[in-house]
């Protein structure tokens, strides 16, 4: 992943704010590994998924999350972009019946991700959104029927 200082054309302002919020959480935390773990779990990713996303082994992700290894600044930058892109996928999924893959592809490009990573990131975003939606629907049904 390459980072550039070019102006963002496709990335919406809300997503830039989302990135800043994640950055603040990770960088200002006394336990950045725990924050990283919480985001990974929020998006329903395994350590293997996160490793594939970050081009690291699962064991490296585990060491970062457990605080044995401090995440590098480069790791944190890529992590923030990855989580933001997955959030963009989820929002796109929630707002539209069909997803604008071209839009998401352009955000991924602005974030410095290769085109080859996009299908995996789309899969992670869609699966985590669908699981969350199913959980909410199940909870509503249980409340409706008094279970």
Where is each model-derived feature located?
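Residue-level signal for the short linker/turn that defines the boundary of a DNA-recognition helix
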Residues: 34, 44-45, 71
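Short acidic DE-rich linear segments
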Residues: 132-147
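The DNA-recognition helices of helix-turn-helix-type DNA-binding domains
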Residues: 57, 68, 83-86
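Residues within the helices of the helix-turn-helix
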Residues: 37-38, 48
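N-terminal flexible/basic segments that precede or flank functional cores
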Residues: 1-30, 78-127, 144-147
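Short, basic-rich loop-to-helix N-cap that marks the start of a DNA-contacting helix
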Residues: 68-81
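Short alpha-helical DNA-recognition segment
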Residues: 44-62
């Amino acid at each position: 992943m390459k980072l550039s200082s070019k102006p963002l054309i496709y990335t919406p302002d809300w997503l830039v704010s989302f990135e800043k919020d994640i950055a603040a959480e990770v960088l200002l935390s006394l336990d950045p590994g725990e924050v990283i773990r919480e985001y990974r779990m929020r998006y329903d990713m395994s350590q293997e998924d996160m490793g594939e996303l970050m081009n690291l082994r699962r064991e490296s992700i585990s060491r970062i999350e457990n605080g044995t290894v401090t995440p590098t600044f480069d790791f944190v930058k890529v992590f923030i972009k990855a989580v933001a892109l997955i959030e963009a996928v989820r929002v796109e999924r929630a707002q539209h019946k069909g997803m604008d893959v071209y839009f998401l592809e352009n955000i991924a490009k602005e974030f410095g991700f290769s085109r080859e990573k996009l299908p995996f990131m789309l899969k992670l975003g869609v699966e985590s959104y669908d699981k969350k939606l199913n959980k909410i629907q199940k909870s509503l049904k249980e409340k409706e029927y008094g279970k």
